[in-house]
């Protein structure tokens, strides 16, 4: 049974937790993370959700909810490792964006890792496939409805900044 800590919209801890699946009171939030893994060639790692999950079959970046007692960065490191087997340190995460929605403080991170697909250890309960794609291909996939809404929104809101980050990775 997982519990999530609750916060105000300004991230002040409320000192309360809620069980996964329970309604979150209006004006209260829990932390959700997304991690976009980019390799030194500028390719983005996508994982495909298993068919039986919400948005089954859609492609996404690693992510999930911070459990009680976890910081956003700790959750990002844990989710990336659980879903792909990729190890990252908190200080390797580049904070890219935060989106506040109905009940979520959704933190988006970028991490640079060169990991061949053959070295990934996919969490079979959540992920059924993985692939490296260019930013242009990711845009195409989002337009065709092949990505989760979260990825599509990230591209829509922050695509230019992601392009700059990728150029920085490739050329620096």
What kind of feature is each model-predicted range?
Residues 45-46, 61-94:
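The catalytic Nudix box helix
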Residues 18-21, 56-57, 68, 95, ...:
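Nudix hydrolase/Nudix homology domain
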Residues 1-34, 40:
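Acidic, metal-coordinating catalytic segment for phosphate/diphosphate chemistry
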Residues 32-63:
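A glycine-rich, hydrophobic loop/mini-helix early in the fold
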Residues 28-30, 92, 125:
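Short solvent-exposed loop/turn micro-motifs enriched in small/polar/acidic residues
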Residues 6, 37, 46, 110-111, ...:
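Conserved hydrophobic "DFG−1" position in protein kinase catalytic cores
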Residues 4, 28, 43-44, 58, ...:
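A residue-level structural signature of the nucleotidyltransferase/glycosyltransferase Rossmann-like core
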Residues 10, 39-42, 50, 112-117, ...:
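Short loop segments at secondary-structure junctions
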């Amino acid at each position: 049974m997982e519990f999530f800590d609750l916060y105000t919209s300004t991230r002040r801890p409320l000192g309360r937790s809620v069980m996964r699946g329970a309604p979150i009171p209006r004006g209260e939030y829990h932390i959700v993370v997304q991690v976009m893994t980019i390799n030194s060639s500028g390719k983005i790692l996508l994982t495909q959700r298993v068919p039986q999950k919400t948005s089954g079959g859609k492609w996404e970046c690693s992510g999930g909810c911070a459990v009680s007692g976890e910081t956003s960065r700790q959750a990002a490191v844990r989710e990336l490792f659980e879903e792909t087997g990729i190890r990252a340190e908190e200080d390797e995460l580049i904070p890219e964006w935060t989106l506040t929605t109905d009940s979520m403080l959704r933190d988006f991170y970028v991490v640079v890792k060169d990991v061949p697909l053959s070295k990934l250890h996919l969490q079979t309960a959540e992920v059924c496939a993985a692939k490296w794609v260019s930013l242009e291909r990711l845009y195409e996939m989002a337009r065709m409805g092949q990505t989760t809404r979260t990825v599509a929104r990230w591209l829509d809101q922050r695509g230019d900044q992601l392009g700059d980050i990728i150029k920085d990775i490739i050329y620096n």
